[in-house]
Amino acid sequence: MKKTILASSLAVALGVTGYATTADHNQAHASEENIDKAHLADLAQNNPEELNQKPLHAGAYNYNFVLGGNEYTFTSNGQSWSWNYTAAGAQSATSNSVQDVTTQATTNTNETSASEVSAQKQSSNTPVAAVEAPKASSNTQTSAATRTYKVAQTSAASTGGSVKAQFLAAGGTEAMWNSIVMPESSGNPNAVNPAGYRGLGQTKESWGSGSVASQTKGMINYGESRYGSMEAAMTFRASHGWW
């Protein structure tokens, strides 16, 4: 996936120590600095919204390292910042590039393969892709499909900690967050795709908007009523690419 974020402010570092800049290039590499690689990797895997909100610290930096079979890159030129990770040696990555630190709107662009799109058929919650494979076709397609999300101007209530913390406090689980929320909306409670699907679980139903707590309860009710249990809903999402 490739996500482009327009953030509202340029903030300071979040829990990352040992960053420094050089007098000549105003940049630092992970191999040269004592950075917390495990913490950065955990943010990229489990808390991408924190990385999307602000750079690691003020000024330019360039951190690149391999950990746990994935290659991570965090860069900034002092005005915009980006981060990405991918399986070591792979060609596709999950990346975020923040282009304008003063704008109020946020745009996320997720790139997925068309083979994934072919699995996204009749779900009332799946984002509509720009390229749709024929339903009955079993041919492998190599062209890329792009999904675009735009954040609504009215955001969900953010009191009570991060989006993930609110999600877990409202009855959500780590498994739901990783297998449904992150693939559907990247953890953005205000994500809206061009077809009108919205929220953490990407739906057109009423529970797709409002507070994180109300969206979480709506997801649970939907999963249990449609699939019998959230475990069954997660299994279906994992095998079909939509739910």
From Swiss-Prot:
It is found in: Secreted. It is an enzyme of class 3 (hydrolase). Its EC number is 3.2.-.-. GO terms for cellular component: extracellular region. Residues 1-25 form the signal peptide. Keywords: Glycosidase, Hydrolase, Secreted, Signal. Its main location: secreted. Residues 99-116 have a biased composition (Low complexity). Residues 117-127 have a biased composition (Polar residues). Residues 99-143 are annotated as: Disordered. GO terms for molecular function: hydrolase activity, acting on glycosyl bonds. It comes from the Bacteria. Is able to cleave peptidoglycan. Belongs to the transglycosylase family. IsaA subfamily. This is Probable transglycosylase IsaA. It comes from Staphylococcus xylosus.
